[in-house]
Amino acid sequence: MTAITDIIAREILDSRGNPTVEVDVYLEDGSLGRAAVPSGASTGAHEAVELRDGGKRYHGKGVEKAVEAVNTEIFDAIGGMDAENQIQIDDIMIELDGTPNKSRIGANAILGVSLAVAKAAAQSANLPLYRYVGGAHARLLPVPMMNIINGGAHADNPIDFQEFMILPIGAETFRDAVRIGSEIFHVLKKELASQGHNTNVGDEGGFAPGLSSAPAALDFIMKSIEKAGYKPGEEVALGLDCASTEFFKDGKYVLEGEGRTLEPGAMAEYLAELAAKYPIVSIEDGMAEDDWEGWKALTDLIGKKTQLVGDDLFVTNSARLRDGIRMGVANSILVKVNQIGTLTETLDAVETAHKANYTAVMSHRSGETEDSTIADLAVATNCGQIKTGSLSRSDRLAKYNQLIRIEEGLGPQAKYAGSSILRG
């Protein structure tokens, strides 16, 4: 009944108007699983590779080759297989590709199939995806890390750091957390407008004002939290995504917006100063992806009390994560399904993190779709945190709305992670 009878891939558009892959998987009993693949702007050098067509069409960003690979090679390899055999199906696709980074068939092709297979199997079992993947113990609703001011590669402004986030740790429920985030978002919009800043939004729905420094952005957010009627640090904490690889040049951190260049040790000290001055509980990619010494310095400095998330550092890859664990580097992994390219490898990365007492943060990409799979995966893995953008743009809100539905479906079983995510 759960045998795969057909796989149909197509080229659709993501939230930036760029092509991406969508896959439908049909089963013998009529079940359908559909998944659309996200795409990043600031990508780690060690990520699995998206297959793009090149040429003039869509400025080289077309995905017809990846679509063709799904409709022919991948279908020939897994057609007829039982959709419940997720690990075996993912392994076959990895072997079929035959490269260490999925560059022949494309991680975008493989991931689309991997997620659609799981969704089809869940529908066949008459289970929500989070329950099918996570089992009976999947009930923890994540703290949303809401990216309300954008800089770096996500915005056209002088701010060096890529994301400034609010975390409603004092909320009672996920539904409350979304409300708190929304209220602060709208206060921030008024605050920015009153100071003459534009309130256009970036790729992830956050504002991209012409501020020149991290402290300036943090000050605006602190003021907005208080004006919305909440206590910074107690009810709402702050998070940063520095995306430091983007401004790491010749062994130094070049903060153009702030007009200074820092050695790795000084960069770690600067982040420690910010974490001491503001209620910052999480810093992502505080150091560059291959600056392992800088990462070690930062971890030694503030790792006991601040969540230090490896995104470009670990790229959702269990092998790189194990290296980091062995070296005592960072204490958390950002989980992006398209960085590694299959559901099986994604779940393995979360499990590896949890076994080492590292936290895991489920995450979107800057190029998203209306697909809300990561909302289910956040609950399935009980990871307790999700990054899926700001409180605007339907590609971001699709995930928040799905989590509201999941919380409602769980009823009294649902538990909001809240302040349990804090270190120290």
From Swiss-Prot:
Binds a second Mg(2+) ion via substrate during catalysis. Its EC number is 4.2.1.11. InterPro entries: Enolase, Enolase-like_C_sf, Enolase-like_N, Enolase_C, Enolase_CS, Enolase_N. It comes from the Bacteria. It catalyses: (2R)-2-phosphoglycerate = phosphoenolpyruvate + H2O. One of its GO terms (molecular function) is phosphopyruvate hydratase activity. GO terms for cellular component: cell surface; extracellular region; phosphopyruvate hydratase complex. Keywords: Cytoplasm, Glycolysis, Lyase, Magnesium, Metal-binding, Secreted. GO terms for biological process: glycolytic process. SMART domains: Enolase_C, Enolase_N. Mg(2+) binds at D241, E284, D311. Transmembrane segments: none annotated. It is found in: Cytoplasm; Secreted; Cell surface. Belongs to the enolase family. This is Enolase. It comes from Rhizobium rhizogenes (strain K84 / ATCC BAA-868). The lineage of its organism: Bacteria, Pseudomonadati, Pseudomonadota, Alphaproteobacteria, Hyphomicrobiales.
